[in-house]
Amino acid sequence: AKAYHSDEEDTVRVVTRHKAYVTIDNRRLPVNQDITVPAGDHAIRIVILAQEGFPCIYINSKYLVTDGTWVCDHLAGGPVPVGTWDAYTSPEDDPTVFPFAYETIHPVKVVNTDEGKLYDFGREMFSVVRFDADPAATVRVVYGESKEEATEPAEALIRETVTGKAHYDLVPRAFRYICVKSDGAEPANVIADYEYLPLEDRASFSCNRRDVKKIWDICAYTLHLNSREFFLDGIKRDRWCWSGDAYQSYKANNYLFFDPEITKRTIVALLGKPPYEQHINTINDYSMYLIIGAYEYYYATGDKEFIQVYYPRLKALYDFIEGRTNEAGYVCQRPGDWIFIDWSDIDKGGDLCAEQILFWQCRNAMASLSELVGLDGDSYRKAAEKLKRNIMRDFWREDRGGFVDCYTTGREHITRHANICAIMYDFVTEKRARKITRMVLENDEITQITTPYFEFFELCALGKMGKLTAVQKKIESYWGGMVKLGATSIWEQYLPEQVGIQHYGMYGMKYGCSLCHAWGGGPIYLLGRYCLGVYPTSVGYETYAVEPNRGMYKHIDGKVPLPEGGEVTVKMDGHTCTVYTTRAGGTLILKGKEYAIPVGEAFTVEY
């Protein structure tokens, strides 16, 4: 529904695929027919019964169009803004058909094996396999992210057997290799149609170290592959929205695509609808990442309307989290809960410190979100302050310079995770953060991180503490380690001490490890944020900083996207730094000095 004005008589046609009728100025009229509307002020309301698909309409007249100015309801409750997306711009478009693009990929190599013909398509992708075959033949297709998986049918995660057709367009799958075996004539014209969401790469990064550019490109490709209807965790498995994984994708998105729509879609998909009966993905920390991520989305974009619409759900989720705390006021494991944090040797025998620091940040986020929609956030801030005092009392060990995992088991075990969170979210003073960095993060006796997931968080903490060289070295050794082993996308887990096909095993499955996992895209954010040095200093990048740091690189050259199509380019060597931006509000911070960055012209500082 909406109110609008027409300066003259106009013809309006409401196009829809559903049962519906339109009311204009209290006149009930049919859809999918031309309606003559006189000049003047009008009120229009459309009632739709959509038994299948999304209830949707299309109007494109002189004075009335379908856009974001409409509101809707479900005949109960108050109106909310409609959903729109510029991917659908004509009456022939169907919002139930997601706007993927396709590119035909031919195999780069074909070899005969005992299990059939092995087709190598050159790199990981998500594609529809197409081929011609003898209708009388039975054809088996085995998919593999590695050639070993594709040629071991008994252990491969995805296999498909077809018969009875002369041509096949198989269900889209994730793979680099397929092994095809027929009991009749060999299938012909085997190709793959790469299916992807056509997001534009609006960022770049290069330096004097060529391997870094390759790592950056593969990380960008990994994020591309997992950017679909929503941010997925991986394209082979689980092809699912996991909130912690998605939280990292939101961050990388802002430094590669800066596409608000996919972040919003993912947040909405994860939120679902109240009442909440379990944590998001059943994981306590993932519920909190969703609330924290919603606030960070607002801070990056300034999209207040989105928060206003979904605040009631965020509030309901927070109340669910709060309602499952224990007598000490701590997040704890209730029946059905999964205390995850990371795949690591963490003492989870009682209340877990990392969970409590996330809960503290979650309360701060709720305070800001509440104030944004005109409600009082003070109660959340006071609760956060009380929680912080308790965490410092129970978990902090001054003599060891870090937080223990759990204070009730007597093990006094220190891992990196809680200490990383403490730095990332400014939970501790700078003095204590430096102590944590020295005594925990730079301490090789503390168990190392084994997943790109929490390795990303650790590098965020190190970057925040000015340890850029350590970040750069880890990118080259950890992410670069996968690339040197032939990875064309970043893996779910990488253990450098493993060899051969050991890298592919996980969860008790020989090929269970995902070789294309979105949480591997961290260097996109890390290099854009801490090397090129671009970050917002107020909501929606109304003001922002460019604080470049070469670290161990001799020169850097890159671009970071900004909201509303803006961008900032940074070039820096040992003597000069040049910044070019298309958006006002930027400040260059270099060697302790600040410079206002002009818009639309190269700004160079010698140092």
Regions found by a protein language model. Give the residues of each.
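Conserved small-residue packing positions in alpha-helical repeats and bundles
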Residues: 295, 367, 423, 458-459
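Non-catalytic C-terminal accessory modules of carbohydrate-active enzymes
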Residues: 472-607
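Active-site acid/base region of carbohydrate-active enzymes
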Residues: 191, 198-218, 224-225, 231-248, ...
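Extracellular/oxidizing-compartment recognition motifs
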Residues: 1-229, 262-263
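Short beta-alpha connecting loops at secondary-structure transitions
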Residues: 299, 339-349, 404-408, 439-446, ...
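Solenoid-like repeat scaffolds
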Residues: 273, 408-412, 441-449, 477-483
